[in-house]
Amino acid sequence: MQLPVQLSPPLALAVLSIAACQIALVWWFQRKRTNPLPPGPSALPFLGNAHQIPLQYPERIFSQWARTYGGVMYLRLFKKSVLILDSVKAAQDLMDKRGAKFSDRPQLTLITDVFAFKPMMFTMPYGDLWRRHRKWYQASLESKAALDTYNAVQETETCTLLSALVSEPEHFADQVKRFTGAILLEIVYGHAVTSVKDDLIRLSDEMMTQAVSAGSLVATLLDFFPFLMHIPEWFPGGGFKREGARVRHLMRQLLDVPFNEVQQAMLEGSGKACLTTYMLEEQAEHGDLTPDDVDNIKGAATLLFIAGTDTTITSLLTFFLAMVLHPEVVHKAQAEIDRVVGRTRLPGLMDRDALPYLDQVLKEVYRWNPPVPLGIPHQVRDDDVYNGRHIPGGSMVVSNIWSMSRDPDTYEDADRFWPERYEGKSPDELARSDPRRIVYGFGRRLCPGRFLADSSIWLAVARVIATLDIRKVRDAEGKEITPSAEFISGAVSHPKPFSLDIRPRDEVAAKLIAQ
């Protein structure tokens, strides 16, 4: 059968192209109809679900919603699609197994454009520059050979921590900050810390305090309404620019000062091996350093210092809070260390496998108060389908790590601090219940410093328990003051300020600390 009209080849190609586009559009709309969005609470026009999310402890309302809508929920914040993952399985299925699609990062306007946290891997979109930073971290933080080189500084700083806790127990939180900062500054810059008043530790602490004070509301509004960046400082709501300028000034110092010290030491031939010298030397192999190269090295070094410091401090302060509330845990862990290690030396990293109860204590610290309760959001690159539900490309993906750490199917009586929950489990059950599989994130954006952080925390915990008694302080009438197990709402979940009494267990422990 002949067509009544003969089409020229170019015209025929155009007609076929239009027809193909129409078929594709029909298929796409049918796909949208046959694959509904994940369930979630009803949204309002314009606002979406923004009015339903509290500024304080949003992870808790997400956890409540998950009981109704399941482990994968869809929200809309203004015009932005947001996927809340309340299930470990969903987080692993999407971010671990579909990393090519789920490893991007949403625009974090306050952090990148106002605070100038850049170029830093945690704010970068998934791409070549991100891979470059990741390669630097992997070489320095994820191989056993590299991690072994840090044992000496970890050993030294834990001994310094013990002495400081005994001499100034009332300032234990400052000593924890010094301990954490000292390890990271030595590893990142070859910078030796001799005091809690170290300039770089003070600078980092001040910068993080100022950044947190800017508030999550400003961050949310800027991310969804970037035009707010253009309002003047004097305009109502423009105060974030003044606060941002202070943070930016402090961040500039953190980027420049330690890096310049390292460069100067290298020029003088007195540079110490550290992450920054490694990155400089590695980059020099590819030619002269460009200004972009220098900026990237500064950003990679600074990120490891500030991010590693804040989360490690949180875990150690959570440990102290748990121990003052649960002296029976301290006594049980002390008995294990005494039996395995003895009283003539301090426990070391080589003892870790022989101290299972101590490892349970640390697992429970991570689970009881995950340092970053909602993780750092990912972004979906392209449309996807999961369990028959449509996931729009460009959606922000938030992992509710806090809720995952309280999954009743895995953790009975989840609000209770109870290291014994990990006893008597099969290898599969132990792997499934280990909170370290969730607290450091998921997929290709898994925290690269997790092994260093975990070993530093373990060594500090082991040596504190081996040598010190942690007790409640007493008031003027001699009554014990029991601290509250409460945590500050925010990107990082710090325990609310509390007091405790720290003393050597006995004369044997005091001598070990003094050595």
Curated annotation (Swiss-Prot):
The chain crosses the membrane at residues 9-29. Its EC number is 1.-.-.-. Heme binds at residue 447. Keywords: Heme, Iron, Membrane, Metal-binding, Monooxygenase, Oxidoreductase, Transmembrane, Transmembrane helix. Its cofactor is heme. One of its GO terms (cellular component) is membrane. InterPro entries: Cyt_P450, Cyt_P450_E_grp-I, Cyt_P450_sf, Cytochrome_P450_fung. Pathway: Secondary metabolite biosynthesis. Disulfide bonds: none annotated. It is a single-pass membrane protein. One of its GO terms (molecular function) is oxidoreductase activity, acting on paired donors, with incorporation or reduction of molecular oxygen. Its main location: membrane. Signal peptide: none annotated. It is found in: Membrane. It comes from the Eukaryota. Belongs to the cytochrome P450 family. Cytochrome P450 monooxygenase that is able to use delta(6)-protoilludene as a substrate to produce delta(6)-protoilludene-5-ol. This is Cytochrome P450 monooxygenase 67. It comes from Postia placenta (strain ATCC 44394 / Madison 698-R). The gene is CYP067.
